[in-house]
């Protein structure tokens, strides 16, 4: 029988005693408040960067006690243990809990100390589909996780290979983030190949900042092939060392062939003004593309011009991020002209350009574009604000530009959009 919140509150002290660890007070408080209110606990958020846990982060033993108490839960759907000190032993306990807690849907383990062995245990849980002929028993020994974040853990190639193996049989997972995990080309290739060959249920994939030493961009080919054949809608490939050749491969074999890609994050790569022609192709041929992040690629003016010419042909692009792309005033003007030439209803509603060089002409073009878009009922939210400054001492009126945060309710969140 599935455990209720009252059962969890009764089980946790014994679990702490068995694990020989102190109780995590924010968890105790959440359980107590729910029981006192006669309510059921549906989420547990124990982020180690929070004020309550900053100086007392959850370690492996603490995670084991929490996992033991949550095993078999019928109410808790989300568990956030990000930015703690959970090791492989803690991950093993969490994996055992996952295999016996079909109510659990979202697990956040970002920024911990989980290595290849712990990743393999989590992968085993993801691969579990029930092994009993009895329906009730099978349901209690299967993992129904939909979202898994393990970015910022030292998983290595072996950890990603284990998770890739699980993806071949898992049918519940919709979101996976394994970025910044000390993995190399073997690990990222294994994940891409597994999705390409055997997985059509994953929707969001993050694999940023792998340890790559190749100059051939063969890893990009595997990502492109995966995009073309899978149901992935959101893909994060930041710091993948994608150059002009790599972006050409991604555009021609991946985005152009994908029927569902909505969010593509290519920040901090090596895409230059030559590669911008392929970016323009992505904008024109990505019929479902809503979000494109090109932050910190050296596109320069020529790259900005190529992208600007493609913008009127974009189908669904809602947000474009080109911060710190070495764009001078000519490129800034070209981007304003490109959006102005786009039908108002199809213009991006969020544009990020801070970190580039706004000249006086570029400021005036963008000031006019922002005002005109607002007048026709299609406002553009930018990460900068342009303000006319009154002329003084006979000087000509000029425009001032300053940084501005884009409101959360306006921005397209690349991770939650799917």
List where the protein language model places each region:
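Leucine-rich tandem repeat or coiled-coil scaffolds
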Residues: 1-418
